[in-house]
């Protein structure tokens, strides 16, 4: 507990907020190139093969990014757009690839939540 005198002399220093996506350096998204596309198994109660990509961002930082949706067309040297957002059951995965931007195609046959997966509106869908 500081004394009144200490508060007058030094004041209170505001706490620095730690970024949850430091590799983006304050940007909403960053472009990157896939170095390796693979699968990863999730943490304990869950079981699956989650699709991930190792991406070298335009600022030179390498990150592991999750590929959302069913099926993808990504391979080595694909150019992708990366956003922040962790995957709770994959340790160390703090970024996601944006589907439907650059080389990442949208999810085929997606009818609900299409904007999140870069899917075009189907011809027969009514309002």
Curated annotation (Swiss-Prot):
CDD domains xrefs: Ribosomal_S12
Q: Which InterPro entries match?
A: NA-bd_OB-fold, Ribosomal_uS12, Ribosomal_uS12_bac
Q: Which GO BP annotation is one of this protein's?
A: translation
Q: Name one GO cellular component term.
A: small ribosomal subunit
For the region Disordered, give the residue spans. Answer: 11-30, 105-127
Compositional bias (Basic residues): 11-20, 112-127
Asked whether the keyword Ribonucleoprotein is assigned, the reply is yes
Say if the entry is tagged with keyword RNA-binding: yes
Pfam families listed in its UniProt record: Ribosom_S12_S23
In terms of superkingdom, the source organism counts as: Bacteria
For this UniProt record, give its keywords in alphabetical order, as a comma-separated list.
Methylation, Ribonucleoprotein, Ribosomal protein, RNA-binding, rRNA-binding, tRNA-binding
Q: Which GO terms describe its molecular function?
A: rRNA binding; structural constituent of ribosome; tRNA binding
Q: Which PANTHER family match?
A: 30S RIBOSOMAL PROTEIN S12 FAMILY MEMBER
Its annotated function is as follows: With S4 and S5 plays an important role in translational accuracy.
Protein name stated in the entry: Small ribosomal subunit protein uS12
Q: Which species is this record about?
A: Thermotoga maritima (strain ATCC 43589 / DSM 3109 / JCM 10099 / NBRC 100826 / MSB8)
Designated gene of the protein: rpsL
């Amino acid at each position: 507990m500081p004394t009144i005198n200490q508060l007058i002399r030094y004041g209170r220093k505001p706490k620095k907020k730690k970024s949850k996506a430091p590799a983006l350096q304050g940007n909403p998204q960053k472009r990157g190139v896939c170095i390796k596309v693979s699968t990863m198994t999730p943490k304990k109660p869950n079981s699956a093969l989650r699709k991930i990509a190792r991406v070298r961002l335009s600022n030179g930082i390498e990150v592991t990014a999750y590929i959302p949706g069913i099926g993808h067309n990504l391979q080595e040297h694909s150019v992708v757009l990366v956003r922040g957002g962790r995957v709770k059951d994959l340790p160390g995965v703090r970024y996601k690839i944006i589907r439907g931007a650059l080389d990442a195609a949208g999810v085929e046959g997606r009818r609900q939540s299409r904007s999140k997966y870069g899917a075009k509106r189907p011809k027969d869908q009514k309002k």
